């Protein structure tokens, strides 16, 4: 029985030494950074919706109602970056006035 205990103690000691020598596991790669919006003057409706935190359908409805200014370039609909800021400022003013 003493030899079994001695062998077990020796095995545990060698395992402890191996664990002490082992390098820590590498940290996982960080999540890729969220894509930033392009630094353009005119944004697509989808880009404007993302910046406002709204859905595409709601943003199209705001454009159709005139609440968000937009321009047409051929068949394309674009929203000036300033129109997004103006819309947000109007919302804040309405909320603070109420």
UniProtKB/Swiss-Prot annotation:
Species the sequence originates in: Saccharopolyspora erythraea (Streptomyces erythraeus)
DNA-binding region: 42-63
Residues spanning the membrane: none
Key words, A-Z: DNA-binding, Plasmid
Origin: domain of life: Bacteria
Disulphide bridges, residue numbers: none
One GO molecular-function entry: DNA binding
Gene from which the chain derives: xis
UniProt keyword annotation of DNA-binding present: yes
Protein name: Probable excisionase
């Amino acid at each position: 029985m003493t030899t079994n205990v001695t062998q077990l103690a020796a095995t545990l000691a060698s395992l402890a030494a191996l664990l002490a020598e082992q390098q820590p596991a590498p940290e996982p790669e960080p999540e890729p950074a969220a894509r930033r919006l392009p630094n353009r003057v005119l944004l697509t409706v989808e880009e404007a919706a993302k910046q406002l935190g709204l859905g595409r359908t709601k943003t199209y409805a705001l454009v159709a109602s005139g609440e968000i200014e937009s321009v047409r370039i051929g068949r394309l609909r674009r929203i000036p970056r300033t129109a997004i800021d103006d819309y947000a400022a109007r919302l804040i003013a309405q909320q603070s006035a109420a």
